[in-house]
């Protein structure tokens, strides 16, 4: 019946909300012209206001707090007036002796609100602004009460009795003072079963005989009165037999209240939908951050979600939390099922900063938003062509219905899809429904389409004030500028530019614009999470000492709490904003990696891990850890890298295609090649290739990585023709899917293959082409490596090219020694020694110190890498130099090192166990 069940998504009047209204009458009494009693200072008055505001916005639980908890918090908030506040609250409840008193109470609540069109207000007049947060709360309570039917009023009256009885039993158990219980005992002694129907019936007869007028809530037919009487009696008997304690669900970072003594329908005591959604968002963050730890209980989360879904089935975010929980529990079939449920049930109702469309139609169940969700799901599951078709349809419907917000999000999703997935051609799919793409040219490349979509999405998001989308688009534009050379659509004519290079200044500008616009997040409407987090933190701090005790523990209540102690929580931003700021630092780190500045890349990664590690998504945090581990492997060696990798494996979930697993396989492959264990290296290549999806265009980064490592393994095995075939096939794939940066690496690999096969002349064009690509994309460190390979190729043509090779090497030396890793620096040192030894115009006796210093540096750096082949070459050259100088002891020592590395290279099985 109406009023006995909670309407989905409705704001319901509950005993807790009545408690807040009673306290609001104290905070802002009607027609008060000065500081109201019992406040002795403005600070006390403001502190109670902060407390009431926190009660209406906190999202630390799904259930409203019990009266016992409310009284305990009042003792912390009220300081010396806590006893008066508690007595007033309990006395006011005891004065609600009939449903008529509830009507009078809510009529009195109108008096604390100021008029919406009021004129001049005196300075010392206390009026609750109807449009303020507390004013809106009071107005919603009054409206919700006025909408209650007669059964609803009776049920609310009955729930107040249970609310007060529960507090009485709790305080009696812990020996509460008698002066705080007198009012509650009155409620405990009331026979609400007899009163619920007998007293109203007597009043009906009295009112009829006296004046013929019946109060609004008693103006009810006899049949309905009898039905309600039976219903209330049955509910009372059921609640008495079902009284039992239930343990609190241990949700991570969550609920502090226990779900005790379910005397009435628990759904009636749920918090508002906004508060519950804020709580669920915090739980989603907790599952992502702590879901893989051993202390995290997925079963308790599941039981909590089951309970919430029964109480509030309209909250579709429950399916998303269940998906995350199942995912971290390795139950992938259940995770997929819940994810599909979330997309099915929540399309158009959650998850977007929506702006009302110009048509004014309903915002719920929008078809275009359902298409957007479906397209993103196809994208995440690795179905790029299906995703592109669905997103194209979403663009068409969004334009047809004038939903500019959904159109902006869809364009951003399409540009992200085209950037991340390998789509060779979009003809026949993209462009038919979106006029800016269609009108520009019919033969646009995928790269040009991505750029147009990004610019259009950015323009629309900026005009609609979608700050998060604007910031996200700026970061996407920075990534586009980093990875692609912008060529004009019409690249001919006398004024056509011949300079085709990426612009690091543009990349930096886009990143800074994204971070700058994120600071304006407060202008958006989605501030529920901000206020909820602040309010929850403020309420939790009521139970903590604010600082060193000013008064001795025996001196009574704490008086050092002031209004200004809220400053501890002045800085609080939504998780999505924090993740975007962190993503900008990760993008900075990636750009510095490509540009070749290892210190800057490491610094930005450390900034991210330090400032945003706790608030970031598990995927971004995992990426930051792996960047630091890669830095350790390149500049410190495998021992430190594997130690850090072990920590990362414990922290993050290691599943198929996880970043931790991929990095582990990459490090194992590098170490296997350096140690000469080619069988292990080939097995790891097969594992990497097996992790990639067989679908065309999916997992392109992983496929390129596996092919590169396969070619390098074949090169180490001296199977030059097969290695060249794999590299050529990989280059064709990169060209087909417009992977320009990967082209530079593949060309450099082809030059290495020809160099080691003895065909230096054939390797020169590949090295020069790689350098050209590096110049276009500002890949300074890769260019230095390609220059070193080019110098080695020139030296391979004969000793008469020694000077040219040395000039090339010395030109790249600043970049190699300043930013190169251990292997690159060792190669440069060994090659420099080779040049001096091959130069017929130089003498070993005169340049011996230069040669030996280079070889010693190379030997020391190769020791950490366990690179036996290069280390053996360095030891061999050192032995030759010592032999020409007649230093026999040093020659024998270098020869023994050479023998040691050769033996280790020929017997790799001895080190295979250490790689697992």
Curated annotation (Swiss-Prot):
Keywords: Cell cycle, Cell division, Mitosis, Nucleus, Ubl conjugation pathway. InterPro entries: Apc5, Apc5_dom. GO terms for biological process: cell division; protein ubiquitination. GO terms for cellular component: anaphase-promoting complex. It is found in: Nucleus. The keyword Cell cycle applies. CDD domains: Apc5_N. Pathway: Protein modification; protein ubiquitination. The keyword tRNA-binding does not apply. It comes from the Eukaryota. It holds the Pfam family ANAPC5. Residues 234-255 are annotated as: Disordered. Residues 234-247 have a biased composition (Basic and acidic residues). Component of the anaphase promoting complex/cyclosome (APC/C), a cell cycle-regulated E3 ubiquitin-protein ligase complex that controls progression through mitosis and the G1 phase of the cell cycle. The APC/C complex controls several key steps in the cell cycle by mediating ubiquitination and subsequent degradation of target proteins such as cyclins. The APC/C complex is required for the female gametophyte development and is involved in several aspect of development by controlling cell division and cell elongation. Involved in the control of endoreduplication. The APC/C is composed of at least 10 subunits. Interacts with PYM. Belongs to the APC5 family. This is Anaphase-promoting complex subunit 5.
